């Protein structure tokens, strides 16, 4: 008994002695990639990467359990027969870092290496100085690559393509290659041979290399000045199409034609002078050529011939200005950001290879038309928001005109105007569209055969819109549509359950989840396991012959789970495989063993995100990878769900994070961090990491703080500031019922919308000893007409219908804009505040932070503002994030732990000392 007691005491002492996280731990904290299972073999692979440094890819055999590790691997691919793998080895992080410090030129920087891994023995063959790697979609025997050539007198040129047999390691070299493209099976490479001007031995042309035979065939000879474009293979890999301009005359420099190679022959299938190409228009090589209708047609792009620049004008004498007009679709700020896209915009046409006819499907009035890969019909729907683009400045609700486009002649029929259709999805057979009608708040089906429009969900007695949405606009649907393979049934999600609806109306709708979601207040989400990719990607469908998996989350407890239903059995019932205080994700199945092995990730705040395998999810899985075992070495933390009823009747939730060595007999400083609603993330893993904008919860908890993250509840009456205040104050009241809360040392922190709420709260109460406001809006009246420079759009829409939740324009709701603006109540502030407002913020105008700071300064308040140079809304530079982490630590440490005030807070950093000291 004495021994046991001493052991218990020792354990407690060891626990108490666990060190707190410090700012040096970030780089080694790792993330786990999604596991992947290629083809139908036994192999699974995943990558574990530190935040800064070199990651390791792990390849695991589901049959034998054997594992190979591949340091710094990327672009990893396993061969069809499962015997080899090909990948790039990136240079070591420190080597690249040192080269950057020494300011080496690009050609002197460390280079990638090509690696071929023998999955039987683990042996790796390496090929250094890799420039570019070309791997076929189905890796069988060959890959191709180019090298960085170091010596000018080398026989190998940088344009030379090396074809490598990964089984025999034999190589072949193809000279002066551009644009090589494997076909799907990896047996052939189509490429352009383009010798240099001084090379008199080789001719330019489109070539085809047969890897098995080692033979190159020049399919089309061309002048060295001719333009030969990228190759577009069909899915079978037995033909390809390409753009070319063989006319080297200057007058023809911008005209291209379309060619195909099929049945051993190259043919021009579309001439730039085709009668169906309107005057002033031309063929464009952007976005490319697409095979359709069983390889009997090609989608091609047309575009207006661009305006030529007047070269007689002197550049420096030309006015440089932007002209804003009220009748343009988009503001100049949007147009400038989209200028590159618009200059390259093309309009879809369909080329029938049988008769050479060209049908224009899209134009400037109906710019977005697409023909799905497997579509075999004559007509399809297309929609445009063009007539409603100006109103999108303030109206987020979906609005489109919908047309029925005839693929035979390009004619179009107006189906509906100004319709609020969204989440539009075409059935796999191309016969039916389903979409969500935001006004009717139901799912609809449109039959292409007869134009019949059917309401799919209004009569089901449940809502298919987000019942919790609290924005002043039409609520979005609770999810998208997932088609069944039969193109007749579609899966739709209400708040809790997954419904199966027959779009023909013959079968009665039913819940695939058997109503358990609503009965148990558990939300179900279809989670189809990772499946083999397709050469041309297609939407994922539900196959009734395969089990359907569901990720679940209980709305009350926030616990996650996994369920399954075997649709191949007539009387199959939903089976809950596992449920508990975790979040499950990333299902993938290796079907090579006799009993399929399922890989999945499981995570929680306490354990992190780890990888498991199992043949039976109802039993505890086998740990494949513990991503961050060092969690056990530090004073980590726990998370609890705090639930209570507010005085106004709202059933409220908040997450409460406590240190691992929490002692209820002690007093703890508290930081309230908030944004909107985060309680559903209770079981998400959280890594220590440099802050891009907000307090890092693991770090602060480990260092003796309690962190409370309350959900914010908005009442949709135009008072979001008050709603945030009431939500945070209510959570504070509830938490303060615990004697361990140090009520004299409580702080608040948030970023962006959270930063705004922090700014508002400190103008209404002095309850908090310190506040951190990242990228806050301080003056809604000036922010209303500001620009989100990252997208170019005006911010008005955010206030009238979006996150800022005012619900009115500035003039009809001026009192609301005034009442919700922290700037006008700055004289009330008593709380010291740290602001971050960066000068390249693309979301919140930088001057909003300046307005707030200068007002606080004018009113004699305690305030600091961090302005990271050339930084965005959330910090991108890791060195900046590390700096912010230290300053958040010191700021809250001073006011909530009574630690000494650092130099940067006491004296600032004068501009004359910028870059010389950080003032820590």
Predicted regions and their residues:
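Active-site-proximal cap/loop segments of hydrolase catalytic domains
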Residues: 687-920
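Surface beta-strand/loop "capping" patches
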Residues: 531-542, 634-649, 916
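Beta-propeller folds
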Residues: 16-598, 603-609, 902, 907-909
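Bacterial Sec-dependent N-terminal signal peptides
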Residues: 1-19, 777, 786
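Cap/lid segment of the alpha/beta-hydrolase catalytic domain
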Residues: 459-471, 618, 625-745, 749-751
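Conserved glycine-bearing catalytic or ligand-binding loops at nucleotide- and phosphate-handling centers
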Residues: 612
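Glycine-rich His-Gly loop
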Residues: 385, 553-554, 603, 673-677, ...
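Active/binding-pocket-proximal capping segment
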Residues: 448-464, 505-519, 568-570, 580, ...
């Amino acid at each position: 008994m004495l021994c046991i007691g001493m052991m218990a005491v020792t354990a407690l002492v060891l626990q108490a002695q666990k060190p707190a996280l410090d700012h040096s731990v970030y780089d080694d904290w790792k993330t786990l990639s999604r596991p992947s299972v290629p083809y139908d073999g036994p192999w699974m692979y995943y990558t574990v990467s530190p935040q800064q440094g070199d990651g390791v890819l792990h390849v695991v055999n589901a049959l034998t359990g054997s594992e190979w590790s591949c340091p710094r691997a990327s672009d990893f691919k396993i061969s069809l027969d499962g015997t080899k793998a090909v990948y790039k080895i990136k240079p070591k992080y420190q080597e690249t870092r040192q080269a950057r410090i020494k300011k080496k030129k690009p050609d002197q920087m460390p280079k990638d290496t090509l690696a071929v891994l023998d999955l039987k023995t683990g042996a790796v063959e390496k090929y250094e100085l890799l420039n570019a790697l070309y791997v076929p979609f189905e890796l069988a025997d060959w890959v191709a690559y180019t090298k960085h050539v170091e010596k000018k007198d080398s026989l190998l040129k940088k344009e030379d393509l090396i074809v490598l047999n990964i089984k025999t390691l034999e190589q072949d070299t193809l000279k002066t290659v551009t644009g090589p493209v494997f076909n799907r099976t990896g047996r052939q490479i189509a490429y352009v041979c383009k010798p240099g001007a001084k090379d008199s031995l080789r001719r330019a042309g489109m070539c085809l290399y047969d890897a098995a035979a080692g033979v190159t065939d020049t399919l089309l000879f061309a002048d060295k000045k001719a333009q030969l474009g990228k190759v577009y293979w069909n899915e079978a890999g037995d033909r390809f199409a390409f753009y070319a301009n063989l006319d080297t005359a200057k007058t023809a420099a911008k005209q291209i034609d379309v060619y195909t190679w099929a049945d051993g022959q190259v043919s021009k299938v579309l001439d730039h002078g085709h009668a169906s190409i309107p005057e002033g228009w031309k063929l464009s090589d952007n976005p490319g050529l697409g095979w359709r209708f069983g390889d009997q047609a090609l989608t091609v792009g047309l575009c207006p011939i661009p305006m030529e620049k007047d070269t007689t004008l002197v550049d420096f004498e030309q006015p440089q200005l932007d002209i804003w007009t009220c009748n343009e679709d988009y503001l100049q700020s949007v147009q400038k950001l989209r200028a590159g896209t618009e200059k390259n915009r093309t309009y879809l046409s369909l080329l029938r290879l049988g008769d050479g006819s060209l049908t224009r499907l899209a134009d400037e009035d109906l710019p977005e038309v697409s023909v799905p890969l497997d579509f075999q019909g004559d007509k399809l729907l297309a929609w445009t928001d063009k007539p409603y683009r100006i109103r999108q400045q303030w109206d987020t609700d979906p609005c489109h005109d919908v047309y029925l486009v005839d693929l035979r002649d390009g004619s179009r029929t107006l189906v509906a105007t100004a319709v609020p259709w969204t989440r539009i999805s075409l059935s796999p057979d191309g016969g039916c569209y389903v979409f969500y009608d935001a006004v009717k708040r139901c799912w609809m089906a449109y039959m292409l055969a007869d134009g019949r429009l059917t309401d799919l969900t209004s009569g089901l007695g449940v809502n298919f819109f987000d019942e919790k949405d609290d924005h002043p606009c039409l609520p979005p649907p609770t999810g998208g549509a997932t088609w069944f393979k039969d193109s007749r049934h579609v899966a739709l999600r209400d708040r809790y359950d997954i419904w199966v609806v027959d779009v023909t109306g013959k079968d009665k709708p039913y819940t695939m989840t058997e109503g358990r979601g609503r009965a148990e207040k558990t939300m179900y989400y279809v989670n189809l396991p990772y499946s083999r990719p397709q050469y041309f990607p297609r939407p994922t469908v539900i196959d009734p012959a395969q089990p359907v998996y569901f990720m679940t989350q209980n709305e009350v407890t926030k616990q996650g789970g996994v369920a399954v239903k075997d649709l191949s059995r007539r009387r199959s019932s939903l089976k809950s495989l596992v449920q508990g205080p975790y979040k499950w994700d990333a299902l993938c199945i290796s079907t090579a063993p006799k009993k399929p092995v399922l890989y999945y990730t499981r995570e929680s705040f306490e354990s992190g995100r780890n990888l498991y395998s199992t043949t039976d999810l109802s039993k505890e899985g086998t740990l494949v990878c513990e991503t961050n075992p060092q969690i056990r070495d530090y004073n980590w933390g726990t998370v609890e769900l705090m639930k209570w009823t507010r005085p106004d009747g709202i059933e409220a939730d908040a997450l409460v994070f406590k240190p691992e060595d929490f002692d209820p007999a002690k007093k703890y400083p508290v930081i309230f961090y908030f944004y909107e609603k985060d309680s559903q993330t209770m079981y998400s893993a959280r890594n220590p990491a440099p802050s891009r904008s907000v307090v890092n919860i693991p770090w602060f908890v480990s260092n003796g703080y309690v962190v409370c993250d309350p959900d914010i509840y908005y009442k949709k009456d135009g008072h979001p500031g008050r709603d945030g205040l009431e939500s945070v104050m209510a959570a504070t009241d509830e938490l303060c019922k615990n004697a361990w809360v140090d009520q004299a040392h409580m702080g608040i922190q948030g970023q962006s919308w959270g930063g705004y709420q922090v700014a508002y709260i400190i103008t209404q109460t002095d309850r908090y000893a310190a506040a951190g406001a990242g990228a806050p809006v301080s003056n809604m009246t000036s922010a209303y007409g500001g620009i989100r420079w990252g997208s170019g759009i005006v911010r008005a829409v955010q206030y009238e219908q979006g996150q800022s939740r005012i619900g009115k324009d500035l003039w009809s709701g001026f009192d609301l804009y005034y009442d919700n603006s922290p700037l006008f109540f700055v004289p009330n502030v008593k709380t010291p505040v740290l602001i971050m407002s960066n000068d390249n913020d693309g979301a919140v105008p930088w001057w909003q932070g300046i307005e707030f700071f200068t007002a606080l300064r004018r009113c004699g308040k305690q305030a600091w503002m961090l302005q990271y140079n050339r930084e965005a809304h959330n910090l991108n530079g890791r060195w900046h994030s590390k700096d912010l982490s230290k300053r958040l630590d010191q700021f809250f440490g001073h006011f909530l732990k009574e630690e000494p005030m650092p130099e940067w807070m006491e004296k600032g950093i004068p501009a004359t000392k910028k870059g010389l000291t950080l003032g820590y």
